[in-house]
């Protein structure tokens, strides 16, 4: 099923498949430095589903920006280059993860035109939230996700 999902994803012009958070990677590499940067909450989003779709794009001129996305200290998207083509990932968020989560967008580089900037779209069933972000080597933007009652 996983390979079929990947094939379907490639056919419609985006990458990646669903994953469950506990199977993700511990923070390694440059993203391991996330605690050394200031984290700035730029938006709070209330969600109702047990899975969310994350969609990443470069925001404006494609200049080589690369980000890692970290959910509650787990890398869920490692070192993803941003472009005008959507990068999509479905993440499962079981109730056992709690009702308040922090999604950090960690700049792995600044691209050729600082700062590192992009657009994150979070899809929660039929609800869609667009979050523009900017980060650099001193601060990382974060989205707070709160589960609806």
Walk through the language-model features, giving the residues of each.
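Terminal leader/tail segments of proteins
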Residues: 1-71, 77-149
């Amino acid at each position: 099923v996983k390979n079929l999902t990947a094939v379907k994803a490639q056919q419609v012009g985006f990458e990646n498949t669903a994953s469950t958070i506990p199977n993700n990677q511990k923070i390694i590499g440059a993203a391991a430095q996330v605690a050394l940067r200031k984290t700035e909450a730029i938006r709070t989003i209330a969600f109702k589903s047990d899975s969310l779709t994350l969609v990443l794009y470069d925001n404006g001129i494609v200049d080589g920006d690369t980000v890692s996305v970290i959910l509650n200290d787990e890398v869920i998207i490692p070192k993803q280059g941003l472009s005008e083509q959507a990068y999509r990932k479905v993440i499962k968020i079981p109730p056992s993860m709690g009702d308040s989560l922090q999604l950090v967008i960690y700049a792995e580089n600044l691209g050729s035109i600082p700062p590192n900037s992009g657009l994150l779209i979070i899809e929660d069933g039929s609800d869609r939230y667009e979050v523009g972000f900017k980060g650099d080597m001193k601060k990382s933007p974060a989205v707070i996700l709160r589960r609806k009652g």
